[in-house]
């Protein structure tokens, strides 16, 4: 049968490309400030490419936040710093 792994647990995966080497600790801190303490932030490809994996998160109404909304929140936070 099908064996589930972390890739199938749900959530949002984002790939962000920077013009210069990414500061991973800063990216992690910015993502954690949004309430994603369990997010994974890592380089892939080059030091300028960052993959961010966000776990499923519920909104104030108890329903899961849409991936597009999560992505927009993270990109807004990363662009603000």
Go through the PLM ranges and name each one:
Residues 1-81:
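A structural signal for conserved, well-ordered secondary-structure elements
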């Amino acid at each position: 049968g099908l064996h589930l792994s972390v890739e199938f647990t749900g959530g949002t995966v984002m790939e962000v490309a920077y013009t210069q080497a990414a500061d991973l600790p800063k990216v992690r801190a910015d993502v954690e400030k949004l309430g994603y303490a369990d997010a994974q932030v890592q380089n892939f490809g080059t030091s300028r490419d960052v993959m961010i994996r966000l776990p499923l998160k519920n909104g104030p109404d108890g329903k899961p936040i849409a991936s597009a909304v999560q992505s927009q929140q993270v990109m807004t936070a990363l662009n603000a710093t």
